[in-house]
UniProtKB/Swiss-Prot annotation:
Free-text comment on this protein's domains from its UniProt entry: The transmembrane helices are not perpendicular to the plane of the membrane, but cross the membrane at an angle. At least 2 of the odd-numbered transmembrane helices exhibit a sharp kink, due to the presence of a conserved proline residue.
Function: ADP:ATP antiporter that mediates import of ADP into the mitochondrial matrix for ATP synthesis, and export of ATP out to fuel the cell. Cycles between the cytoplasmic-open state (c-state) and the matrix-open state (m-state): operates by the alternating access mechanism with a single substrate-binding site intermittently exposed to either the cytosolic (c-state) or matrix (m-state) side of the inner mitochondrial membrane.
Annotated family: Belongs to the mitochondrial carrier (TC 2.A.29) family.
Reactions listed under catalytic activity: ADP(in) + ATP(out) = ADP(out) + ATP(in)
GO cellular component: chloroplast; chloroplast envelope; cytosol; mitochondrial envelope; mitochondrial inner membrane; mitochondrion; nucleolus; plant-type cell wall
Molecular-function GO terms, alphabetical: ATP:ADP antiporter activity; copper ion binding; mRNA binding
Designated gene of the protein: AAC1
InterPro entries: ADT_euk_type, Mit_carrier, Mitochondrial_sb/sol_carrier, Mt_carrier_dom_sf
Name by which UniProt lists this protein: ADP,ATP carrier protein 1, mitochondrial
Subunit structure: Monomer.
Motif extent (Nucleotide carrier signature motif): 311-316
Length: 381
């Protein structure tokens, strides 16, 4: 009998959305149900993750949001195309809804780099202050600056996920019960890192452009000031002119490292804590597993958040006179000049953004049921 495929519940999506971009965005992993509810998981953004019961080697990470869409081989082409398209619409809706919080997160995270470049007059005092100043200086619509690049990124990322999924699944096909925990664990990190880096290679420049646009504050000083970039195409044009291709990929190496670091923390924590806490009546409890996955997702996300900060701070130096020599140099300079706290700036807004995205996805699923009578692929925020 063929296993029945069902879409993830609202609770599962909420867990997957919480602490997403990032390290932008950013390891997300798919939620996998046991037995007849098993779902083929696609890759996600490495800064955050949904949880699994238990985590398996089928989870591969890239910079995409967690989107539950099956490959053409797993379903008819027409249904696949509908799933892919509706997943894109869902991604666009959820990303657009959460875009204001996303921009605030990026502004707070990169404000020290902006101040050094003379593009911000004084630091933000918090999330509320950042919202208020941005709306006052640039207008309400500016909260969505950079969102176009973020939405566009969904489609090539999903296509690349399908292309790399089967290859790396076969290449690192280790089983925990057959090959042992450590070989399975290493294979999981390798497959996630390889798949993530492969997809990231093609879409990284869009993440770079999104970051630069979001951090392009209009009024750095009293009296206002012009923007550095006029739009997405202008980011590419100016970066290529001043720094060449390398400018579009600044921070790429540390981004790949972030995929492996996040997955290592996530799997390591889950496998270590689950046997200790989920015992007796809690062993088969959905809510207990949900809570554990939620806590571990946040723990791994916060622990790897400094990597996201370093890579984005490196992005901000493209086109500038002074650049970091490497990711290690960036890390050392930030610690020396700004303190460890600076590595976690924007983490609070990141959590809010994920919660907002999860809420929008839940509502969008309900809308699909009303309009189409069924749910199609869902895009993450």
């Amino acid at each position: 009998m063929v296993d029945q495929v069902q879409h993830p519940t609202i609770a599962q999506k909420a867990a997957g959305q919480f602490m997403r971009s990032s390290v932008s965005k950013d390891v997300q992993v798919g939620y996998q149900r046991p037995s007849m509810y098993q779902r083929h998981a696609t890759y996600g953004n490495y800064s955050n993750a949904a949880f699994q019961f238990p985590p398996t080697s089928r989870m591969l990470a890239t910079t995409a949001s967690p989107v539950f869409v099956q490959t053409p081989g797993e379903k008819g082409f027409t249904n696949f195309a509908l799933d892919f398209l509706m997943g894109g619409v869902s991604a666009a809706v959820s990303k657009t809804a959460a875009a204001p919080i996303e921009r605030v997160k990026l502004l707070i995270q990169n404000q020290d780099e902006m101040i050094k470049a003379g593009r911000l007059s004084e630091p933000y005092k918090g999330i509320g202050d950042c919202f208020g100043r941005t709306i006052k200086d640039e207008g309400f619509g500016s909260l969505w600056r950079g969102n176009t690049a973020n939405v566009i990124r969904y489609f090539p990322t999903q296509a690349l996920n399908f292309a790399f999924k089967d290859y790396f699944k076969r290449l690192f096909n280790f089983k925990k019960d057959r090959d042992g925990y450590w070989k399975w664990f290493a294979g999981n990190l390798a497959s996630g890192g390889a798949a993530g880096a492969s997809s990231l290679l093609f879409v990284y420049s869009l993440d770079y452009a999104r970051t630069r646009l979001a951090n392009d504050a209009k009024a750095a000083k009293k009296g206002g000031g012009g923007r550095q970039f006029d739009g997405l195409v202008d980011v590419y044009r100016k970066t290529l002119k001043t720094d060449g291709i390398a400018g579009l990929y600044r921070g790429f190496n540390i981004s790949c490292v972030g995929i492996i670091v996040y997955r290592g923390l996530y799997f390591g924590l889950y496998d270590s804590v689950k046997p200790v806490l989920l015992t007796g009546d809690l062993q088969d409890s959905f809510f207990a597993s949900f809570a554990l996955g939620w806590v571990i997702t946040n723990g791994a996300g916060l622990a790897s958040y400094p990597i996201d900060t370093v890579r984005r701070r490196m992005m901000m130096t493209s086109g500038e006179a002074v650049k970091y020599k490497s990711s290690l140099d960036a890390f050392k300079q930030i610690l020396k000049n700004e303190g460890a706290k600076s590595l976690f700036k924007g983490a609070g807004a990141n959590i809010l953004r994920a919660v907002a995205g999860a809420g929008v996805l839940s509502g969008y699923d309900k809308l699909q049921l009303i309009v189409f009578g069924k749910k199609y692929g869902s895009g993450g925020a």
